[in-house]
Regions:
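Conserved Walker A/P-loop ATP-binding site and its immediately adjacent core
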Residues: 104-106, 119-142, 233-238
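Conserved ATPase-coupling elements of RecA-like P-loop NTPase cores
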Residues: 180-182, 199-213, 236-237
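Conserved pre-motif I regulatory segment
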Residues: 58-96
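Conserved helix-turn-beta segment of the N-terminal RecA-like "Helicase ATP-binding" lobe
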Residues: 131-155, 246-250
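Charged, low-complexity intrinsically disordered regions
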Residues: 1-59, 120, 239
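Conserved helix/coil segment N-terminal to the catalytic DExD/H
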Residues: 156-191
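Walker A/P-loop
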Residues: 90-110
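Conserved P-loop NTPase motor "coupling/switch" region that bridges the ATPase
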Residues: 120-122, 165, 192, 209-264
């Protein structure tokens, strides 16, 4: 196996190329010096399929992504690189890194990489009111000057008007989601949801959880990343609603809260 940084491709020499070409439509057969090779784009989706076929293909993001410097000055920490790469490889994922570990930039680096590789289009960041401007909007402005962001804040009419702007990153507080829920039905271009401080949706009986669940799981196919440094602030049972929000099809999580409660 060879990784071509120039072509951003995985090159395989196979006795039976159809083993790969029949399951990966983007794979192509090439002839190089009399050798039959298969070239596959080195992207997250193709990498996952190749791994399922038994090939030990490395994550593409660390190899091919040109990381913008944080605040225009600092390289990512190793933990941030690992986190960003992990998120890029999972359409539904949790980031449970502690406070001060740079989760915000890690998520934005991962989004930026997926956007550049045309895996996703736009992202909606759902976060506490206190972090909309000074954390998320500032991070986009300072580290990703090539991205546009808008903070959806104010009256319902104002939020809906701001949502119509053609930008890369939309930022809204969790309690403001109700004002744009219906409008998001027709926004298939917003195909990634980042829920910052996911533990705010730890109770499936609240309007917060129900609205988030509608946006994440009932409107269109969307990637969802849940971020929190304290997933179970009150009890282990806090995890159930968060799991059902981000990974509703996870068979390891009981369908009903009572069954989960009895386990933990």
């Amino acid at each position: 196996m060879l990784i071509s940084k120039e072509k951003k491709a995985v090159i395989l020499r196979l006795k039976n190329p159809s083993r790969v070409t029949t399951v990966i439509p983007t794979a192509v057969e090439v002839n190089h010096n009399g050798q039959r090779l298969v070239a596959i784009p080195h992207r997250p989706d193709e990498t996952r399929v190749l791994r399922n076929l038994g090939f030990e293909v490395p994550d593409p993001m660390p190899i091919h992504y040109n990381w913008p410097k944080a605040n225009g000055r600092f390289n990512p920490f190793d933990a941030q690189r690992e986190t960003a790469s992990f998120l890029s490889m999972h359409s539904r994922a949790f980031c449970l890194n502690g406070m001060g570990t740079g989760k915000t930039n890690a998520a934005l680096w991962s989004y930026d990489y997926l956007r550049r590789t045309k895996v996703v289009n736009k992202v909606l960041v759902v976060c506490p009111l206190s972090t909309m401007e000074r954390t998320w909007a500032d991070s986009v402005f300072n580290t990703f000057p090539h991205l546009d962001a808008v903070v959806l804040h104010g009256t319902k009419d104002k939020r809906l008007k701001l949502l119509k702007q053609d930008v890369h990153v939309y930022i809204i507080n969790i309690d403001g989601l109700a004002t744009i829920r219906d409008a998001l039905k027709d926004r298939d271009d917003i195909d990634l949801i980042v829920v910052d401080e996911l533990a705010l949706a730890r109770n499936s009986g609240t309007d917060r959880w129900k609205i988030l669940n509608t946006i994440c799981n009932k409107q269109s196919v969307r990637r969802v990343w849940g971020m929190t440094g304290s997933p179970t602030p009150n009890a282990p049972t806090d995890a159930w609603a968060q799991c059902k929000l981000v990974t509703p099809d996870n068979s390891a999580v009981p369908k009903y809260f009572s069954a989960f409660r009895d386990r933990v």
